[in-house]
């Protein structure tokens, strides 16, 4: 049983996403290769793609060091799914309180796409938060404490006393 749901860096249909539009151009490659190479420049691009400066360079370097010790490539499945299978979630089927977190500069999910998802959520106890100065990877950003504050506040909010 899920009591509450939090969606962060969520992508619904990908509508109006310039990042996904660019990735779709390479979809045949992603499908045929199964893996794509990664290096330090790739990791840097994850943090600089949407809005350079939202993550601390020391965090980016530590993240790159950690993942590059594990592998030099990664599966293409998430790219294939985001470019060819969205949407994979039907908001009308989510029956629990839901919080949607979106970074101000998130270049993958457009604000309007997420608002369209939000208004279709049937549960009245729902929230939408746009986080200032954050791009897609909210927990690795300079403003990460704001993310934790919003998350903690939502998850510890008392249940409503009155429900019509």
Residue ranges, per PLM feature:
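Conserved alpha/beta-hydrolase "acid-adjacent" motif
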Residues: 107-113
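Conserved strand-to-loop "acid loop" that flanks and positions the catalytic carboxylate
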Residues: 95-106, 132
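Active-site nucleophile loop of the alpha/beta-hydrolase fold
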Residues: 6-16
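Catalytic histidine-centered segment of alpha/beta-hydrolase-like enzymes
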Residues: 128-148
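Alpha/beta-hydrolase-fold serine-hydrolase catalytic core, especially in secreted/extracellular enzymes
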Residues: 142, 156-164
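Hydrophobic "lid"/C-terminal helical patch
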Residues: 147, 151, 155
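Core-facing hydrophobic residues within beta-strands of well-ordered domains
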Residues: 2-3, 125
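Alpha/beta-hydrolase
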Residues: 16-99
